Regions:
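Bacterial Sec-dependent N-terminal signal peptides
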Residues: 1-28
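An aromatic- and glycine-enriched ligand-binding surface/loop that stacks and positions planar moieties
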Residues: 20-82, 159-161, 185, 192-196, ...
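Conserved, well-structured interaction surfaces
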Residues: 38-47, 51-55, 76-158, 173-186, ...
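C-terminal substrate/ligand-recognition segments
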Residues: 96, 345-426
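Core alpha/beta catalytic barrel or barrel-like domain that forms the active/cofactor pocket
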Residues: 161-167
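Short edge-strand/loop segments of extracellular domains
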Residues: 167-171, 252
Length: 426
């Protein structure tokens, strides 16, 4: 036990110390004063804070987080994700290092906020000065959102966590005690309330228009998610009614805003990798690559490696098209298990089933099929992943292509579901 405590303290200290320096590659050689004297360097610092936003594109030793649950199974037993299946993981033996990653992100946010200055006199005579300052006015509020988001990610995993808003030296970091869960939640909600009206609904009218930045909608969505989790019996015990009310009101706040300005809406089309989707509130953007496809194209397709394979549990969770639950005791359901005319259409946007068309060829997951056992690395579940996979990417060595990848952090559908859940448990 003492060894575990010391290991956790050491990890925290490493993350929270050395705030006089900046882990930003493009700024190597610059000290703190240099960093916050020039606009582009300060912008780079905020970009660094953004860079810690999560994206589950095979981050877990090639697998997605779903492979740690009953939603999926990883095709290769060499991945560290197996720790979650065989019970060998622990708070200090994980494969994603959330603690270290997010406290590093929080340290970067604290550094930005503690050293933020409202003006850059060295560029005030530049032609684009006003444009830059109109962008810059939102930076501290974006940093505060990001810090609150990272605290939510920590609190939902560890519950009581150290709440730090200043840069600490090593000896100070060693003496920080965890804050009560409710205090962390109150901090996140308070930050959301304070910055909500400071951020724009959209950046379209901001000079130097940039997408992917924090908006009012993202702040409201974080508040909604935070209060919903806080109301859960896992955290609230039996004292949840007032918390469910707060969660419902937070979700309704965003719903009312959407009804007034139409900023977001539910859509039928695919929303991942679709930056134009009206359902997107906030997403993590990754540059052009084909790494996710190399991991998850089915075995039997050029360059395929199977990767994260959805389970029957996940497939069964998709309803029939008439809204009824899939029932193995209902022969009609069994006969129409993979019938797009009878099954929830979201199933076929998420999972490649036997007989699905992928890259203009039928998927064969049955034993002896071109994508099934006994091929080495064939799906262990009978299914392959379709969601987030960019089918048009080519892994042909003579004609390899890439594409952008977008991981959804908040979508409008979640807010509606948050509201429904909170009302149902109010």
């Amino acid at each position: 036990m003492n060894k575990k405590i010391l290991s956790a303290i050491f990890a925290f200290a490493v993350c929270m110390s050395s705030c006089n320096y900046l882990d930003y590659n493009e700024s190597s050689g610059f000290d703190k004063e240099d960093m916050f004297t020039y606009f582009e360097r300060a912008k780079g610092m905020l970009t660094t804070v953004y860079s810690y936003l999560p994206a589950d594109f095979g981050n877990f030793d090639g697998a997605t987080r779903a492979a740690a649950t009953d939603e999926a199974e990883y095709a290769w037993n060499t991945s560290g994700i197996i720790r979650y299946n065989n019970g060998s993981w622990s708070p200090i033996l994980t494969i994603d290092n959330v603690w270290g990653t997010y406290y590093t992100a929080i340290r970067s946010a604290n550094m930005f906020l503690n050293n933020y200055q409202e003006d850059f006199t060295n560029i005030e005579w530049n032609d684009n000065y006003e444009t830059l300052m109109q962008q810059y006015q939102y930076y501290p509020y974006e940093a505060r959102f990001l810090r609150a988001f990272y605290y939510f990610e920590l609190a939902k995993r560890y519950k009581n966590v150290p709440l730090i808003t200043e840069c600490l030296e090593l000896d100070e970091a060693n003496s920080v005690a965890p804050s009560d869960f409710d205090k962390v939640i109150d901090f996140i909600v308070s930050e959301c309330d304070e910055i909500m009206d400071k951020l724009p609904v959209s950046y379209k009218d901001v000079p130097g228009y940039e997408t992917g930045r924090i908006t009012q909608g993202a702040v409201m969505a974080l508040k909604s998610r935070t209060l919903l989790y806080a109301a859960s019996p896992l955290y609230a015990g039996t004292a949840g009614q007032e918390k469910w009310i707060a969660a419902a009101k937070a979700a309704k706040q965003l719903i009312d805003k959407v009804e007034s300005d139409g900023r977001y809406q539910l859509v039928d089309e695919q929303i991942w990798n679709n930056l134009a989707s009206k359902e997107l509130i906030l997403e993590t953007r990754r540059g052009n690559s084909n790494d996710f496809e190399k991991l998850n194209f089915p075995i039997g397709y050029e360059g395929g490696n199977s990767g994260t394979c959805p389970t029957q549990n996940l497939v069964d969770a998709f309803e029939m098209k008439d809204g009824s639950r899939f029932d193995w005791g209902n022969q009609e359901h069994i006969d129409n298990m993979y019938n797009p005319e009878k099954r929830d259409p979201r199933l076929f946007k998420t999972v490649l089933t036997n007989g699905s068309t992928f890259k203009n060829a039928a998927v064969e997951t049955f034993v002896g099929g071109k994508n099934g056992a006994p091929l080495d690395g064939a799906t262990p579940t009978g299914y392959y992943l379709k969601k987030y996979v960019v089918e048009t990417i080519s892994l042909n060595p003579n004609n390899t292509t890439t594409d952008r990848h977008v991981w959804i952090l908040f979508r409008y559908a979640e807010v509606l579901l948050n509201y429904t859940e909170a009302l149902g448990l109010w």
